[in-house]
Regions:
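Bacterial N-terminal signal peptides that target proteins for export
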Residues: 2-10
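Sec-dependent N-terminal signal peptides
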Residues: 11-16
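C-terminal motif of bacterial Sec signal peptides marking the signal peptidase cleavage site
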Residues: 19-22
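Bacterial lipoprotein signal-peptidase II cleavage site
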Residues: 24-31
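N-terminal segments that cap or nucleate solenoid repeat domains
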Residues: 31-83, 92, 366
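Conserved anchor residues at repeat-unit boundaries in beta-strand-based tandem repeats, strongest
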Residues: 56-67, 79-90, 102-113, 125-136, ...
Length: 366
């Protein structure tokens, strides 16, 4: 589109001699093929005029200027057929350049102005409003590759409310700023995913809700198209997570609940429990300590509702290494553990007396 607009504008502003007759306020450069006295007439007369560079104008002349209907043809093959006023393209008309760009619609002082249709050689097409040679107001832009936009334009750019569709089935409905999806909007994806919320420069950024095709729902903060910051995620199974996210995954401090009744509150890394946290089981057990890759690993304390308690080392979710096990009556074992069982040498404390003891996979042998 700029090719045509620039050509016409340059002609009007600089008054190039080669195309002076197209836009100049003065038609002195026109050479009539059919001699006459049109320049002195106060009513339009249809004449054929030829410029020295080979451009021709056939149409009405009034007071020495193109006025009314006329056809102007440039030496390179560009052509305008339509209305003129005071030597400029004004009113209804069609311009086609040698490369195949075509504009048909309203003009004002040599520029697209009003309603019109612009077609590219590639097959792309725009129909809608123009102001001073640029897309403005409401219009429809259809690309040759199957994309389309229907909505508001400002200063030649998508700006305001509109609907943008892709050939693969994606669809956006919402606000645009400076040609980009920015503001509030709704995005539909071919696989059934839906996002509704804020956009910045074409990406999901700000507050929003994403419903994935598998039923997972995230509501919270987005940045650069991903869940980032504070949010809440819910799975079809009934699992929920609320807390910090990074790169679309639970990451940082958060709380997760399972349908079984288990609950975890603490640190996450890349979607799994990792770091310091507390896991409360539905049966009343409570673990408070370190986690690694989703399992109890490191130092921690496991308490039972019956009053039993273990404090010590864990490996891959099991009591492993050195630890202290306390019974409800106050009896205590301090020593080694293996796969959740008392194992190895230790000290058994009962009734206030400490006695060396030894266990083999939970069975006392000394």
């Amino acid at each position: 589109m700029n090719t045509i607009v620039n050509r016409v504008w340059i002609l009007c502003v600089f008054g190039l001699v080669a195309l002076l007759g197209a836009c100049s306020d003065n038609d002195d450069g026109l050479a009539k093929v059919d001699a006459g006295t049109a320049e002195q007439q106060s009513t339009p007369s249809a004449e054929i005029h030829k410029l020295e560079d080979g451009s021709t104008y056939q149409g009405q002349i009034l007071d020495g200027k193109k006025n009314g209907q006329g056809v102007y043809i440039w030496p390179n093959g560009d052509r305008y057929d339509g209305e003129w006023k005071d030597g400029l393209m004004s009113g209804q008309g069609t311009f086609e350049d040698a490369q195949g760009h075509i504009y048909s619609g309203q003009w004002k002082k040599g520029e697209f102005h009003g309603r019109g249709v612009y077609r590219w050689p590639s097959g792309s097409r725009y129909e809608g409003g123009f102001v001073n040679g640029k897309k403005e107001g409401v219009g429809t832009y259809e690309w040759a590759d199957g994309r389309s936009y229907r909505g508001e334009f400002s200063n030649d750019l998508k700006h305001g409310n509109g609907t943008y569709t892709w050939p693969d089935g994606r669809k956006y409905m919402g606000q645009f700023q400076a040609d980009q999806r920015s503001g509030q909007g709704k995005m539909l994806y071919p696989d059934g995913e839906i996002y509704e919320g804020e956009f910045v420069d074409g990406a999901r950024s700000g507050q929003g809700t994403r419903t994935q095709s598998d039923g997972v729902v995230y509501e919270g903060t987005f940045q650069d198209d991903m869940a980032q910051g504070q949010g809440r995620m819910e799975w079809p199974s009934g699992e929920t997570y609320e807390g910090q996210f990074a790169e679309d995954m639970p990451h940082g401090r958060g709380q997760k609940s399972w349908p079984s009744g288990n609950q975890y509150q603490g640190e996450f890394k890349s979607s799994v429990m990792d770091g310091r946290g507390m896991l409360t089981f539905a049966d009343g057990r409570v673990y408070d300590g370190q986690f690694k890759l989703g399992k109890r690993s490191g130092k921690g304390t496991l308490s039972w509702p019956s009053g039993e308690k273990y404090s010590g080392e864990f490996v891959d979710g099991m009591r492993e290494g050195r630890g202290v096990f306390t019974w409800p009556d106050g009896s205590k074992y301090v020593g080694g553990f293996q796969q959740n069982a008392l194992h190895g040498r230790g000290v058994c404390s009962m009734d206030g007396a400490d006695t060396p003891c030894r266990f083999d996979r939970g069975v006392r042998i000394e």
